[in-house]
Swiss-Prot record:
<comment type="function">
    <text>Converts N-acetylmannosamine-6-phosphate (ManNAc-6-P) to N-acetylglucosamine-6-phosphate (GlcNAc-6-P).</text>
</comment>
<dbReference type="InterPro" id="IPR011060">
    <property type="entry name" value="RibuloseP-bd_barrel"/>
</dbReference>
<dbReference type="GO" id="GO:0005829">
    <property type="term" value="C:cytosol"/>
</dbReference>
<comment type="pathway">
    <text>Amino-sugar metabolism; N-acetylneuraminate degradation; D-fructose 6-phosphate from N-acetylneuraminate: step 3/5.</text>
</comment>
<dbReference type="GO" id="GO:0005975">
    <property type="term" value="P:carbohydrate metabolic process"/>
</dbReference>
<dbReference type="Pfam" id="PF04131">
    <property type="entry name" value="NanE"/>
</dbReference>
<dbReference type="GO" id="GO:0019262">
    <property type="term" value="P:N-acetylneuraminate catabolic process"/>
</dbReference>
<keyword id="KW-0413">Isomerase</keyword>
<protein>
    <recommendedName>
        <fullName>Putative N-acetylmannosamine-6-phosphate 2-epimerase</fullName>
        <ecNumber>5.1.3.9</ecNumber>
    </recommendedName>
</protein>
<comment type="similarity">
    <text>Belongs to the NanE family.</text>
</comment>
<dbReference type="GO" id="GO:0047465">
    <property type="term" value="F:N-acylglucosamine-6-phosphate 2-epimerase activity"/>
</dbReference>
<dbReference type="InterPro" id="IPR013785">
    <property type="entry name" value="Aldolase_TIM"/>
</dbReference>
<keyword id="KW-0119">Carbohydrate metabolism</keyword>
<dbReference type="GO" id="GO:0006053">
    <property type="term" value="P:N-acetylmannosamine catabolic process"/>
</dbReference>
<dbReference type="InterPro" id="IPR007260">
    <property type="entry name" value="NanE"/>
</dbReference>
Length: 229
């Protein structure tokens, strides 16, 4: 059975939650063994897949979880706004570390390596390719190039202002066009994740609301301060 078919079964049985285990950089939680522990806890709680950033974190996580891992490498480049898995060597390192799915930036922006080249390299390793997109045009272009999974990950992050709510319209447009969509980006409540599934998402990735303790504390502190002012 193919990995996509296996995921279809897991999603049908468990609801389609993917947990992104990416601690705040330099957080006390930003250590491979802690990332792996969070991933294992997420798997035991019913996550159908895990999203991991960085080769060391991926290696540590691969050793303890059996669910599929979406691997990425983030870089801050001087000559490109693209941050997610921008280079061939990133793809190779993630494949060697045990990723099942490799996600790349799928936006139409200046980049060091073309999207189609990165997709070909992912498929060279026999892995599934996911593209993190920001618009319907991004997603449909990446689907035509052969990406098996389209993520709404970058919606709201390629523009001057980031909305507070997730982009359900993008989820629906891509789903209606026949894309296998992972809804991602600002899904901070179970209700929002469920809404994404109703809009046609194949699965939903949740990160900050589950694995970024600093963000969660900030949300509570902000709301509670407003209540007493």
């Amino acid at each position: 059975m193919s990995l996509l078919a296996q995921l279809d079964q897991k999603i049908a049985a468990n609801g389609g939650l993917i947990v992104s285990c990416q601690p705040v950089p330099d957080s006390p939680l930003d250590k491979p063994d802690i990332v792996a522990a969070m991933a294992l806890a997420a798997e035991q709680a019913g996550a159908v897949a895990i999203r991991i950033e960085g080769v060391a974190n991926l290696q540590a996580t691969r050793a303890v979880v059996s669910v599929p891992i979406i691997g990425i490498v983030k870089r801050d480049l001087e000559d490109s706004p693209v941050r997610i898995t921008a280079y061939i060597e990133d793809v190779d390192a993630l494949a060697q570390a045990g990723a099942d799915i490799i996600a790349i930036d799928g936006t139409d922006r200046p980049r060091p390596v073309p999207v189609e080249t990165l997709l070909a390299r992912i498929h060279h390793h026999g892995l599934l390719a996911m593209t993190d997109c920001s618009t319907p045009e991004d997603g449909l272009a990446c689907q035509k190039l052969g990406a098996e999974i389209i993520g709404t990950t970058l919606s709201g992050y390629t523009t001057p202002e980031t909305p507070e709510e997730p982009d359900l319209t993008l989820v629906k447009r891509l789903s209606d066009a026949g894309c296998r969509v992972i809804a991602e980006g600002r899904y901070n409540t179970p209700a929002q994740a469920a809404d994404a599934m109703r809009h046609g998402a194949w699965a939903v990735t949740v990160g900050s609301a589950i694995t970024r303790l600093e963000h969660i504390c900030q949300w509570y502190n902000t709301a509670m301060k407003k209540a007493v002012l």
